[in-house]
């Protein structure tokens, strides 16, 4: 009996601790980039879906942007097509783009929507092509040439890899106002109707800016931002983050995520959060508890 009472008291403590956060964020929009291990582990997938439904239930407006790199890679391998990566991005020819679009919009997006709906939510799946949500343009990368005597960098054609040119929030606004949960695959459309594969972190950041979101949440496969000793950095302002970039603490795969977060907070998003998607209920723990579990970035304290 004592264990049961203790357990009940713990639940009550969690609920009362969450109350001021629920009140603070009611009516606010939270953009979540969903990816990494959280998308491939069944328990984590269900945990994430329940978190999103709970957010909507208490008056928060979640908007989900998802990736799907591992799923794309598996299908490309099955059809015998090799993937080439440059600066961490997949070179995407026409055939690869067709597969990317098939996987993201036809498989991954529908699975997320189905899980959210199974847990009592009302999710609607979109790509950036729906309602001209994501206007895209071709992304060109540059790299130093092999010949050191040539100072002009080489321009790399990445095929159907794009960047966000403009966000048209109308369809998302309509869905949110109608109590639906938008789930968006990061495929944009160009001026000529071409499809472009866009990094999901970048789409999430730009969408958070365009929606005037309260928060941008990026789920990753790390605990958050770590210092050089491997200790979690829980709260930072933009100036501190820039210093960590300058001294090399933030580098490699984390750098694009952090730059995306910085751009969002500079553009008016109240805060950006780097969370460990491998932790069950990571989103709810960050939003509704005093301690949180990841790294919070604000423009200023």
Curated annotation (Swiss-Prot):
An individual GO BP term: L-arginine biosynthetic process
Protein EC: 2.7.2.8
An example molecular function term from Gene Ontology annotations: acetylglutamate kinase activity
Lineage of producing organism: Bacteria, Pseudomonadati, Pseudomonadota, Gammaproteobacteria, Chromatiales
Organism superkingdom: Bacteria
Ligand binding (substrate): 68-69, 90, 197
Family: Belongs to the acetylglutamate kinase family. ArgB subfamily.
Species name: Nitrosococcus oceani (strain ATCC 19707 / BCRC 17464 / JCM 30415 / NCIMB 11848 / C-107)
Site (Transition state stabilizer): 33, 257
NCBIfam families attached to this UniProt entry: argB
Annotated function: Catalyzes the ATP-dependent phosphorylation of N-acetyl-L-glutamate.
One GO cellular component, as annotated: cytoplasm
Disulfide bridges in this chain: none
Catalytic activity: N-acetyl-L-glutamate + ATP = N-acetyl-L-glutamyl 5-phosphate + ADP
SUPFAM superfamilies associated with the record: Carbamate kinase-like
Key word Nucleotide-binding present: yes
Compartment list: Cytoplasm
Listed name of the protein: Acetylglutamate kinase
Enzyme class at the top of the EC tree: transferase
Pfam families from the UniProt entry: AA_kinase (PF00696)
Keyword Protein biosynthesis: no
């Amino acid at each position: 009996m004592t264990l049961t009472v203790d357990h009940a008291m713990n639940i009550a403590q969690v609920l009362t601790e969450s109350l001021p956060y629920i009140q603070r964020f009611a009516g606010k929009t939270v953009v979540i980039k969903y990816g990494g291990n959280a998308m491939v582990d069944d328990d984590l997938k269900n945990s994430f879906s329940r978190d999103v439904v709970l957010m909507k239930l208490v008056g928060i407006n979640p908007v989900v942007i998802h990736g799907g790199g591992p799923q794309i890679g598996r299908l490309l391998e099955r059809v015998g097509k090799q993937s080439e990566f440059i600066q961490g991005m997949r070179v995407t020819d026409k055939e690869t783009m067709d597969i990317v679009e098939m996987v993201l919009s036809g498989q991954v997006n529908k699975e997320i929507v189905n899980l959210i709906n199974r847990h009592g939510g009302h999710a609607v799946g979109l790509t950036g092509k729906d309602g001209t949500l994501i206007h895209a343009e071709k992304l060109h990368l540059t790299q130093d040439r092999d010949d050191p005597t040539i100072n002009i960098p080489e321009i790399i054609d990445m095929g159907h890899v794009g960047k966000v040119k403009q966000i048209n929030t109308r369809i998302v606004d309509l869905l949110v106002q109608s109590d639906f949960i938008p789930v968006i695959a990061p495929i944009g459309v160009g001026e000529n109707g071409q499809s472009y594969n866009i990094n999901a972190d970048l789409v999430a950041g730009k969408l958070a800016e365009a929606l005037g979101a309260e928060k941008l949440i990026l789920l990753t496969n790390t605990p958050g931002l770590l210092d050089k000793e491997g200790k979690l950095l829980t709260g930072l302002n933009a100036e501190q983050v820039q210093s960590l970039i300058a001294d090399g603490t933030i580098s490699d795969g984390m750098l694009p995520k952090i730059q995306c977060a910085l751009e969002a907070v500079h553009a008016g998003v109240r805060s950006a959060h780097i969370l460990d998607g491998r932790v069950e209920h990571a989103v709810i723990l960050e939003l509704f508890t005093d301690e949180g579990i990841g790294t919070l970035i604000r423009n200023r304290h």
